[in-house]
Amino acid sequence: MAKKSKNLRAALEKIDSTKAYSVEEAVALAKETNFAKFDATVEVSYNLNIDVKKADQQIRGAMVLPAGTGKTSRVLVFARGAKAEEAKAAGADFVGEDDLVAKIQGGWLDFDVVIATPDMMALVGRLGRVLGPRNLMPNPKTGTVTMDVAKAVEESKGGKITYRADKAGNVQALIGKVSFDDAKLVDNFKAFNDVIVKAKPATAKGTYITNLSITTTQGVGIKVDPNSL
């Protein structure tokens, strides 16, 4: 604990908490101040001036990062017949129907992404209380309820991330790993920022992005100037 506190203090000393850094500076500083002993995840966090209670100000979706995520996702697909075979051929880790529902109801959760064909959603609905709180419930807005299961599996395996604004207007997303080149992290950050900017509700008032930061697993938050993106 003492060593962790020492590392944290050392990291904080390198950061000017009153400054909003450019995206390039922030990425470099996030890597420099990372003290995790493993290949830490790099994440960005937005606070948006939106009211998610209003239907037209809810922000949710998915995208494929240009440089990938550095993470291998375990993909589960609910499908039958030809669509099940397509999912398997595309590289899905788990494919099934009632058997998977029973397994999940029994406490099994060794997967990161859940995809389903539309005709399977009545079955998947039984898992709402398990998958919903973990943001694993398939949804058309994130491309995880689809007949094109092969594409969905390939995207999930190839750098797809999902995002959603919480009740306070916060949106968080991973943009890669500390081991990534700075340029790849910057590219991913800019690509995600473009999606967030384009998602601005027409009815949103005032400054849209009120706070933006980048951090690593166990790292400290570094303010980013939205105008640098």
From Swiss-Prot:
Entry similarity comment: Belongs to the universal ribosomal protein uL1 family.
Q: Which SUPFAM superfamilies match?
A: Ribosomal protein L1
The record ties this protein, via NCBIfam families, to:
rplA_bact
Q: Which CDD domains match?
A: Ribosomal_L1 (cd00403)
Give the CC-aspect GO terms. Answer: large ribosomal subunit
Q: Which Pfam families match?
A: Ribosomal_L1 (PF00687)
Taxonomy, superkingdom: Bacteria
Keywords from the UniProt entry: Repressor, Ribonucleoprotein, Ribosomal protein, RNA-binding, rRNA-binding, Translation regulation, tRNA-binding
In terms of HAMAP family, this protein maps to: Ribosomal_uL1_B
Record-linked InterPro entries? Ribosom_uL1_bac-type, Ribosomal_uL1, Ribosomal_uL1-like, Ribosomal_uL1/biogenesis, Ribosomal_uL1_3-a/b-sand, Ribosomal_uL1_CS
Q: Which Gene3D superfamilies match?
A: 3.30.190.20, 3.40.50.790
What this protein is called in its record is Large ribosomal subunit protein uL1
Q: Which GO terms describe its molecular function?
A: rRNA binding; structural constituent of ribosome; tRNA binding
Relate the protein's function as given in its record.
Answer: Binds directly to 23S rRNA. The L1 stalk is quite mobile in the ribosome, and is involved in E site tRNA release.
A GO BP entry is:
translation
Q: Source gene?
A: rplA
